[in-house]
């Protein structure tokens, strides 16, 4: 058995330090060393606005704030705090869903669609107080991953937030002349998101529609939003509803990818189609109001402060969507 025994070295008590002594040594503070380390960190971060500086009074003496150059500033709010808003930069927030409670007028036959378009044209002609009548425009068609996009199946329009028109084209070989005349009416300003692509598709599917005249006079809401609000990027209708109208849209994939060519449309499809043009009309009105406010604020500022001050403020990122209360040089 002795050969399997391992002889362990005997610890010497001479080199053993008691645990009490060790703990005392570790607890001794070293204020001088800490101060040197902190001062070294502060020197490395000199001229930087950092919360790690321990002595604020000494830091302010060593690093006085840089003197700002003389320029036009605004006392009411910062002009470019978060940069240019864009669809990619928008922070998702919980917004109430759009609820449309207006009328939905749905037609599938050529004669019914023509009569309805005539009715809308008469309403447009009666708007004598304005030279332009905005009309939200959108389209729907079936889509298959095997065969791609189908023929244009639905046109929906909205000229008044209380009523939306849904025209299903599935049974039509040609679009009624009255509907073509309506969308080409000189007072009508068609608007939507990516609306130019819709007109090109409509012209391919129905040659009696000329795309270019419609493209020349239409308004893309995303482009207009970037011009007025000085935002950037490409907008979807859903993101515009979030940003401009502060509303959420229920863009159900099941409804969006449904069979739009099948007659009749169900209630979910009709509501989906109506909400698209209804919220488009709401967004148009809101951007229009912001544009008018912006032009008014710009004119008042130029009159009070001059063209040079206006250019200086614009260079700082001011949009003039709200009124400037005070300006200092």
Swiss-Prot record:
Its EC number is 3.1.11.-. Mg(2+) 2 binds at residue 138. Has exonuclease activity on both single-stranded and duplex templates bearing overhangs, but not blunt ended duplex DNA, and cleaves in a 3'-5' direction. Essential for the formation of DNA replication focal centers. Has an important role in maintaining genome stability. It is found in: Nucleus. One of its GO terms (cellular component) is nucleus. InterPro entries: 3'-5'_exonuclease_dom, 3-5_Exonuclease_domain, RNaseH-like_sf, RNaseH_sf. Keywords: Exonuclease, Hydrolase, Magnesium, Metal-binding, Nuclease, Nucleus, Phosphoprotein. Pfam families: DNA_pol_A_exo1. Residues 46-65 have a biased composition (Basic and acidic residues). Mg(2+) 1 binds at residues 138, 140, 276. Belongs to the WRNexo family. Residues 130-288 form the 3'-5' exonuclease domain. Residues 26-88 are annotated as: Disordered. Its main location: nucleus. One of its GO terms (biological process) is negative regulation of mitotic recombination. Gene3D superfamilies: Ribonuclease H-like superfamily/Ribonuclease H. The keyword Membrane does not apply. This is 3'-5' exonuclease. SMART domains: 35EXOc. One of its GO terms (molecular function) is nucleic acid binding. The modification Phosphoserine is found at residues 78, 86.
């Amino acid at each position: 058995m002795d050969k399997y025994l391992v002889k362990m070295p005997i610890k010497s008590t001479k080199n053993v330090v008691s645990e009490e002594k060790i703990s005392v040594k570790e607890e001794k503070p070293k204020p001088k060393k800490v101060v040197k380390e902190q001062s070294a960190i502060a020197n490395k971060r000199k001229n930087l606005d950092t919360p790690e500086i321990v002595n604020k009074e000494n830091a302010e003496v060593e690093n006085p704030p840089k003197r700002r150059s003389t320029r036009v500033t605004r006392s009411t709010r910062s002009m470019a705090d978060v940069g240019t808003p864009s669809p990619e930069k928008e922070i998702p927030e919980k917004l109430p869903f759009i609820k449309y409670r207006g009328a939905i007028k749905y037609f599938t036959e050529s004669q019914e669609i023509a009569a309805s378009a005539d009715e809308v044209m008469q309403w447009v002609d009666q708007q004598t107080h304005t030279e332009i009548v905005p009309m939200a425009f959108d389209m729907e068609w079936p889509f298959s991953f095997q065969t791609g996009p189908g023929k244009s199946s639905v046109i929906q329009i909205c000229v008044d937030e209380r009523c939306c028109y849904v025209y299903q084209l599935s049974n039509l070989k040609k679009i009624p002349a009255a509907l073509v005349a309506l969308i080409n009416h000189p007072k009508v300003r068609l608007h939507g998101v990516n609306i130019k692509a819709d007109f090109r598709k409509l012209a391919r599917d129905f040659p009696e529609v000329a795309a270019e005249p419609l493209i020349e006079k239409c308004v893309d809401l995303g482009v207009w939003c970037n011009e007025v609000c000085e935002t950037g990027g490409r907008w979807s209708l859903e993101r515009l509803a979030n940003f401009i109208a502060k509303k959420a849209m229920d863009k159900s994939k099941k409804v969006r990818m449904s069979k739009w060519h099948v007659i009749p449309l169900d209630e979910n499809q009709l509501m989906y189609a109506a909400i698209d043009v209804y919220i488009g009309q709401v967004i148009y009105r809101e951007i229009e109001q912001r544009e008018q406010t912006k032009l008014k604020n710009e004119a008042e500022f130029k009159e009070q402060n001059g063209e040079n001050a206006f250019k200086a403020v614009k260079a700082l990122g001011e949009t003039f969507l709200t009124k400037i209360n005070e300006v200092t040089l």
